[in-house]
Amino acid sequence: MFSEVFELTRQNLERYQVDAQLHACRIQDYKDKPFDIIACNPPYFSTTNQNLMNVNQYKRAGRHEENLPLSELFTAVKRLLKSNGSFYLVHRASRYNELYQYASRVGMLPVKVTFAYDHVGGVAKTVLIEFQFATAHECMIEAPVYLDDRSTFPTIE
């Protein structure tokens, strides 16, 4: 963990008067009560090619899976999510099949999927997935989001 990042997070919570508990540890090591919701924007890139990894330690940790492989992420989520909870994950759309496989290995299925595109006619770059434990029978594919057109963004109610 980076103490500078932790401190910046603490300052932002204080600035915006958010009452929250912070824990500085790897999700793999976190040992507290289960959660109703887990939201995650994990590293997107696998670590198969060391030459492509960023040399900046902060960017490297945030972009490359060397400290949080998908298998470990989903194992931790299985342990930390309540049986009726939801796990929200944003990731590269091109890795959707891999995400689905890791989720199914821990007994989870996608219940809602939204693909995000840079522009109409482009290839999906990002996917937002809501996973739940395998009690769900259907998966809702939401309307696409185009990052260059805010009118396509879902509204928060």
Predicted regions and their residues:
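Mobile active-site "lid"/loop adjacent to the S-adenosyl-L-methionine
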Residues: P42-E72
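Conserved SAM/SAH cofactor-binding pocket of Class I
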Residues: M1-C40, S46-L52, T75
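Conserved Class I SAM-dependent methyltransferase catalytic core
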Residues: E66-A124
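Hydrophobic alpha-helix-in-membranes signature
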Residues: N41-P42, L109
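SAM/dcSAM-binding transferase cores
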Residues: G121-E157
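Phosphate/oxyanion-binding loops and surfaces in catalytic or ligand/nucleic-acid-binding neighborhoods
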Residues: F45, V106, A134
